[in-house]
Design a protein with these regions (language model features):
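Extended, charged alpha-beta segments that form solvent-exposed binding/catalytic grooves
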Residues: 1-81, 85-209
Length: 209
């Protein structure tokens, strides 16, 4: 097939019925987020590479390009960092807590995972300036309700704490390279890869578990 008729690697078209179903879910989520008090913001599809690197993501997963001034840009691969940049620059004097939502495409290059999309669609919220059990409970409740309005019935919500895994890696004096591999596997939810990394480190059973 001519390249002129193909979509780029990891992307897809939506036919009318698919586009309508996608839009219906987006509208339901937008309505739900607003009911919980989250206002929508829109950030640029591309950011400066240095901005996106703050999140600690794997740079090789980013779609990068140069602007006319030879500055390196990248398509956003998640929205937490762009929203943090937005809040720091445009909403820094706003009263807390800030409740913001988004609904956009995100881009991650998956070279060795042909079954995975490189462009996918992400809707979510950011709750800034609230760090208590009620805030945590609200986010969990909203996550569950979001899955329900999207049409899912049988699901499991997994909770994690990044400081726990960071502390465990520090306690075992892991090298920066190994830490990066572990974080990458966790970010991708690649349990098989994570188990291989941990097995190769020969941890004591308690630490490995």
């Amino acid at each position: 097939m001519s390249v002129l008729l193909e979509t780029p690697y990891g992307t897809r078209d939506f036919l009318p019925r698919e586009a309508a179903a996608k839009r219906a879910i987006e509208n339901k989520l937008a309505k739900l987020f607003l009911e919980f008090g989250y206002e929508e913001v829109v950030t640029p599809t591309m950011e400066f590479l240095e901005t996106l690197k703050i999140s600690g993501g794997v740079e090789s997963d980013l779609f990068k390009m140069f602007d006319q001034n030879n500055r390196t840009l990248a398509l956003h691969h998640e929205l937490t960092t762009p929203i943090a940049r937005l809040v720091s620059s445009r909403l820094k004097d706003s009263p807390l807590p800030l409740k913001l939502s988004y609904n956009t495409s995100v881009f991650r290059f998956r070279k060795n995972q042909p079954e995975r999309q490189c462009e996918f669609y992400q809707a979510g919220v950011e709750l800034l300036g609230a760090s208590n059990a009620f805030a945590d409970a609200e986010i969990i409740a909203l996550a569950a309700q979001s899955l329900k309005v999207a049409g899912l019935k049988d699901f499991t919500i997994c909770l994690g704490q990044v400081e726990f895994s960071n502390g465990l890696m520090e306690e075992n004096n892991l090298s920066p390279a190994v830490k990066s591999e572990i974080k990458n596997a966790i970010e991708r939810h690649n349990i098989v890869e994570l188990e291989k990394i941990v097995d190769a480190l020969n941890f004591e059973k308690s630490a490995a578990d």
